[in-house]
Amino acid sequence: MNQNIIYTVYGDLKLTLKNMRPDVLLHNPVMFLTEVSLFVSIFIYIFPSFFGVPYTGTYRSFYVAVVVLLFLTVFFSSISTALSEGKSKAITDSLKKFKTDVIAHVQKDGNIVDVRSNELKKNDIIIIYKDEIVPIDGEVIEGSGYVDESNVTGESRAVMKVIGDTVTGSTRLVTDKLKIRATADPGSTFIDKMIELVEKSTREKTPNEISLTVFLSGLTLIFLVITASIFAISHYFGRTANIVMLIVLLIALIPTTIGALLPAIGIAAINKVSEYNIIAKSGRAIENAGDIDTIILDKTGTITIGERKAVKFYPNKGISDVEFAKLAAMSSYYDQTKEGLSIFELAKKQGAEISKDDLKGYEFIPFSSETKFSGIQSPSDTVIKGSLKALKEKFQVADEFIEALCKEISMRGGTAIPVVHNGKFAGVIELQDLIKPGIKERISEIKNMDIKTVMCTGDDEVTAQYISAQAGIDEYIANSKPVDKYNVVIREKEGQRMVAMVGDGTNDAPALAKADVGLAMNNGTQAAKEAANMIDLDSNPTKLMDVIFLGKQILITRGSLTTFSIANDISKYFVIIPAIFYMFPSLSLVNILDLTDPIVAVTSALIFNTIIIVFLIPLALGGVHYKPTSISEMLKRNLMIYGIGGVITPFIAIKLIYMLLIAWGVTW
């Protein structure tokens, strides 16, 4: 353990020294100018006569203090960035540890051939047995079983995988046997892409960060011109301004605090999202999350728990309970979804015994988001289950009893699945899915931030209305198809609103790509994960709300520290200007702290300028405390804390530092 700590400290120190190189700091104009000032100060100390500055014992000690403090300013800035980069490196290192080279059982021409996982190819058919490592990313094409994904998602509970589900390489099958089709080549797996994304995301600046850097550069240039003007004006009045004093003035006035912490804030944003087991493809995605105006939520899995189960069968008039249970089982025999399996289990409990032999000659009709039904058919028999609207349109059939029953189930928040047998309604299956605990409070927090909520669901109008009212949703879209999500994204963006959404299917890909924040589920399709700009390793749709909170917090952190840094400059101005121009008695009016020793006063300001960076590093890395509220309330609160606080804090701190230096007999 001690050795690990040594390696961590050594690694952070190496990153810190690398970040102090001029070519690296060139991308941060504020800190680059600070480092140039450090080199100039060293040069002045070595060759004072060249610059015509006083070099008595007092001034010599002062120059040393300036050099040390400027070095520490650059060092503390670099170490804050190194700490953030160190966390990102730890994330990529942990992902690399998950990559496992194992033996894979490949099915070729009817035979099973063992090959190493790094020799596999896309579309290879692979057999995985109980307790074996999944050799590569793939899609389940046969069998079912529980897969331990804890090394990727952190979830300790194994996840059930059925036909059509995706599995991730380096996870472990803990039960049964699976046959999968490889969906990636070695080097292009999910984990490989995650490593690439994390490494890439730490290097890119976001648009807001670029804009802020330009603003800080302009501010720095203005203060550089002002400082140079002071040097010229002092010559005009027959005075020689001390260049080291002017350097201290420049460093104290330019926004060194936010300049020092800005890179760390950007990298910390990626790290904070990673702590939620979410991989962001870029800092832009996180930044967009902070500006979201509309959030599109799926009902199942986001508003509700997402595990709909069959709870009751309702036979139509003239059909017995056992007869309808048998029809429900037939319609779900080949349906390997969790809902289909629950229907089959309930039918078995009610005495319906169906085997594969009973269904010889039948063809499976798979469910699709377009048709909204599934079942089986033979030349002489058809059993189909699905949405009421879809079945009525397909079979041109109506039944008042069935329609009333579906409405009653929907009004209590359930999902009604009618079953049609040879063109006539045979009965209704009731599925129930509970609203997630605490979701109403979370939706309320979202609305407090002036964010509009839209729920999309494949359920009918009555169920959608009931669920949206229970959860406090602003707008709902019932009988939703994938194209509806895309249309909502387009509609909201045309209204100049920024949109966030969740998706997991290939049909969600267009909407995910169009949304400003698209969060794909890890258990979703490859197309969805490629279209989205964030991927949730835990496949928890509710995390979209966490992403928005994080985005807001990161933007507020950057804004708060910028406000604090600029407010600091106002205070330091009233400390340093009277100290530099102590020979002009008229300027004593602005010496509101009554600092009588100009050199100690300037040193005190520079000490504060340096140590405030250290105190703000935890805030930059951890983020400013954020409470969901309106923009006006948030602005008012931050101006009070970081604006007024940014003016008052330096006055108090500099005065205390000055008094301590005088008390210790420091007079240079």
From Swiss-Prot:
Name of the gene this protein is made from: kdpB
Family, as annotated: Belongs to the cation transport ATPase (P-type) (TC 3.A.3) family. Type IA subfamily.
Catalytic machinery residues: 298
HAMAP family: KdpB
Binding site for ATP: 335, 339, 367-374, 385
Name of protein: Potassium-transporting ATPase ATP-binding subunit
EC number: 7.2.2.6
SUPFAM superfamilies assigned to the protein according to its UniProt record, in alphabetical order: Calcium ATPase, transduction domain A, Calcium ATPase, transmembrane domain M, HAD-like
Transmembrane domains' residue ranges: 31-51, 62-82, 213-233, 243-263, 573-593, 599-619, 644-664
